[in-house]
């Protein structure tokens, strides 16, 4: 099934997904919210700013500037903006989207002002539009270079999830489906916070024992919050949570882990953000998760500790001592 797809968001991840759709045989148009970035992609037929390893776009992928005037050409819209821009993108789409068009989101995080799930934002603004989330352990560079990758498509509408699954899947990119859109979102968002935590620990040279403990206890924290928000327990041992958590906490391709690494090595917040020189979703998500956990009375020691380092100038070494000397408990 050949489709025409609009991709809003031309960072590394949006571009990698646009490439995957083009490799799959679809006609794809990609748009950046920065006019000069669009002009560069149109002129050079690549996105060297975010994916320098891809010399030229395939013939089915092109940049587009005025997507609003051409909205009727597209069957589906893929939103791949940072979480900070998600709500405004959906609000703009409301003015142009047609009844037969539906949305796929590749954005991970929570709404920055209300701390709502992004699916809740989309459903509130576009209540009759089908919505699916694509998430899981996937670095953009590897997907763009057609290395084997497996992800999850989550939607309340299983038929739409299967449609999106078929849209993307080929011999290099395998999509599974789930109707647990809450669990898939919570896992994909909170793991970015814990990747910062893992980076801090690595920067302080705490070793692999600490790394393993952090991932395991971090997974328990994600699960506690997810269950409180209405997720299914089994989702958290799948690709959208455990898979993504393992990947993002363990490899420096992750901007969140690199950011934490710089903090652990002694940089200030601003120095570390400047060094990463790209969006660090976990920095913003930490505030959302902290407030959600407090609202729902969910204990998340690692997330709270990371929040204190990021927003209350707590010393990481003092935080580690506090974590290790907390009241002793049963694991479960």
From Swiss-Prot:
Molecular function (Gene Ontology), one example: NAD binding
Protein name per the record: Glycerol-3-phosphate dehydrogenase [NAD(P)+]
Protein purpose: Catalyzes the reduction of the glycolytic intermediate dihydroxyacetone phosphate (DHAP) to sn-glycerol 3-phosphate (G3P), the key precursor for phospholipid synthesis.
Pfam families, alphabetized: NAD_Gly3P_dh_C, NAD_Gly3P_dh_N
Annotated EC: 1.1.1.94
One GO location term (cellular component): cytosol
Enzyme class: oxidoreductase
Keywords annotated in UniProt: Cytoplasm, Lipid biosynthesis, Lipid metabolism, NAD, NADP, Nucleotide-binding, Oxidoreductase, Phospholipid biosynthesis, Phospholipid metabolism
Residue positions binding sn-glycerol 3-phosphate: 108, 136, 138, 191, 244, 254-256
Reaction(s) catalysed by this chain's protein: sn-glycerol 3-phosphate + NAD(+) = dihydroxyacetone phosphate + NADH + H(+); sn-glycerol 3-phosphate + NADP(+) = dihydroxyacetone phosphate + NADPH + H(+)
Catalytic-site annotation from UniProt: 191
Subcellular location: Cytoplasm
InterPro entries found in the cross-reference section: 6-PGluconate_DH-like_C_sf, 6PGD_dom2, G3P_DH_NAD-dep, G3P_DH_NAD-dep_C, G3P_DH_NAD-dep_N, NAD(P)-bd_dom_sf
Pathway, per record: Membrane lipid metabolism; glycerophospholipid metabolism
HAMAP family reported in the protein's UniProt record: NAD_Glyc3P_dehydrog
Gene: gpsA
BP term (GO), one: carbohydrate metabolic process
Similarity section: Belongs to the NAD-dependent glycerol-3-phosphate dehydrogenase family.
Binding of NADPH, residues: 13, 34, 108, 140, 255, 279, 281
């Amino acid at each position: 099934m050949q489709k025409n797809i609009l991709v809003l968001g031309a960072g590394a991840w949006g571009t990698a997904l646009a490439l995957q759709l083009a490799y799959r045989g679809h006609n794809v148009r990609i748009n950046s919210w920065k006019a000069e970035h669009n002009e560069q992609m149109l002129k050079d037929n690549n996105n060297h700013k975010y994916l320098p390893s891809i010399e030229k776009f395939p013939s089915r992928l092109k940049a587009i500037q005025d997507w609003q005037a051409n909205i009727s050409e597209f069957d589906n819209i893929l939103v791949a903006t940072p979480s900070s821009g998600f709500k405004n993108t959906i609000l703009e789409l409301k003015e142009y989207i047609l009844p037969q068009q539906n949305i796929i989101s590749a954005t991970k995080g929570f709404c920055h002002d209300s701390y709502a799930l992004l699916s809740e934002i989309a459903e509130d603004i576009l209540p009759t539009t089908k919505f699916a989330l694509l998430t899981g352990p996937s670095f953009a560079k590897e997907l763009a270079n057609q290395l084997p990758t497996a992800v999850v498509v989550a939607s309340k509408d299983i038929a739409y999830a299967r449609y999106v699954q078929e849209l993307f899947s080929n011999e290099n990119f395998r999509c599974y489906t789930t109707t647990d859109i809450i669990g898939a979102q919570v896992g994909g968002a909170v793991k970015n916070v814990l990747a910062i935590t893992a980076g801090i620990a690595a920067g302080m040279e705490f070793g692999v024992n600490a790394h393993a403990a952090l991932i395991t206890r971090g997974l328990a924290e994600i699960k506690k919050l997810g269950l409180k928000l209405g997720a299914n327990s089994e989702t958290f041992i799948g690709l959208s949570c455990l898979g993504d958590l393992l990947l993002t906490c363990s490899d420096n391709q992750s901007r969140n882990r690199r950011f934490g690494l710089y903090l652990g090595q002694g940089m200030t917040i601003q120095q570390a953000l400047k060094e990463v020189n790209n969006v660090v979703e976990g920095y913003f998500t930490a505030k959302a998760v902290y407030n959600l956990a407090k609202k729902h009375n969910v204990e998340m020691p690692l997330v709270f500790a990371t929040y204190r380092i990021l927003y209350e100038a707590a010393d990481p070494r003092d935080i580690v001592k506090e974590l290790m000397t907390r009241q002793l408990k049963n694991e479960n």
